Amino acid sequence: MEIPDNSDQLSSFEFGKAFPLMSGSFSRRTFFAGALVATPLARCLNAIIPEVIKESRTQAAFELRKQTALAQSKRPMASMTSNGDENSFPNRIACFAKGLPQNRFGEVEPAAYNALLAAIKSGKHADFERIPRSGGRKLNNPQAAYTFHLEGGDPHTFDIPPAPSITSEAAQPETSELYWQALCRDVPFLSYETSPIVRQAARNLGATPSSVFRGPTKGDLAGPYISQFLLKPVRYGAYTIDQRYSMPVPGTDFMTTLNEWSPIQSGIPPWREASYDLMPRYIRNGRDLAEYVHYDFPYQAFLGAALILINSGPRSILNCNQFRSGSNPYRYSTVEEGFVTFGQAEVTDWLGRVTTAALKAAYYQKWMVHRRLRPEALGGLIHQTKASIRKYPIHSSLLESEAVDAIFHRYSSYLLPQAYPEGCPLHPSYPAGHATIAGACSVVLKACFDSSMLLPSCVEPSADGLTLVVRSDYSPTVGDEIDKLAFNIAMGRDWAGIHYRSDSVAGLRLGEDVGISVLQDLACTYTEDFKGFSFKRFSGTEVHITPQGEVVQSGGPRHRA
């Protein structure tokens, strides 16, 4: 059965839909054209001009902030619609509860879960401190769901659709995919066409060996599985980072027995750790990709991509290299070059900015709306139902999955093998945080660099990951590789067994929405001859953000001034 591309079903707010044209005496042009410098010249010009400039500049800055805030305030609040699993099962077996007191079957104590709900409802720090814990691990920042953000839309105004219910047939393909990924973790991407287990997985999932476990974009489906931005060296100032990493040895899987799985659900740290290969390797298989997104800092991969592109020209400044965006006003300047604006300082700063904004929106959805259980917990429900230990309302198509039976054949249990000793982090599954960051950072990279440019060469790791092999038959564009990088980072967490595909797809689209909203505000701040940002979303939709913060999407009207 083919894994559905959920991206077309993920409705997102049309940016600026509710934003009226700015009216009144102030506009962006009057801010900087001198219309506000209307203070009477009652004193000597030399004495009054600095004061006039100071006053008008302050007023201009205030009006700009006020108008962008007013525009963003007209965004509707998110719908807060979940899949209903929390209310369907009074014992909360379909909800995230890791780290709370549980019995040996992984069923949360009702009082503990109710305390979590009470804290989420109140938003008070004291109520969060009253949530019972049973292990050494702490909940991951549920109070962040209430945090405000001063650029772009408020975190509570971004919407995503409900996740599939554990009782629905829609849960079967993406859960089966996770079981197949666990079985294929150690197969080199270079060997997919000839691997029996990959061919079996592809056939079962309705894919081909060359397309299985990939994202849906044109960039994802062409060329090597791993993006060039995760393979090529990164110039980090005066230091060059070689992208070979210490990787776990093959077959290093966790939580394949109830004795190991059960205490970890209660938040008890794992009693064993992964064993690592002494030889650094490039990312050559699913396990390596899962390891990369295990210890990365939030926007590491996208900062690396930016540095690769920034340092690919004749000079290491963004506007002087071949990959700078056509909208960069300094591209054709004979006098100025960008740095603070439209340069290296700006793009690297923006990646961090949109990351924080994206995480706030994701954590609002995770904690306040969906509270979706993690795949490792669903694996526990599947195992106990299949083994007749307990009976849970899992859809029959999932219980009869070929992938689940294949896992039992290898591990003698139906649990979902985890790549990380500790399993998932202690926050709910939907949407994926890594994916949300990836979506937001992709918007920044596409806005700042020319997506149509071809990268100078293409490489892929050898089967052992020790070297890079040149692919002379494939010339990727910058945009295609940004898309591939985003899905690599999102799917890396799926390879670990800690997220579902729908978590990743929803996160990527949510991140795009957040990133666009931030650029709407930032686009209004320039005095350069700037025509706006233009790029394509993952769906292929063309987006243009004007200098007035309007968003024009292909096939749609112009929104917000």
Model-derived regions, located:
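Hydrophobic alpha-helical bundle signature of multipass membrane enzymes
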Residues: E2, L10-P20, G24, R28, ...
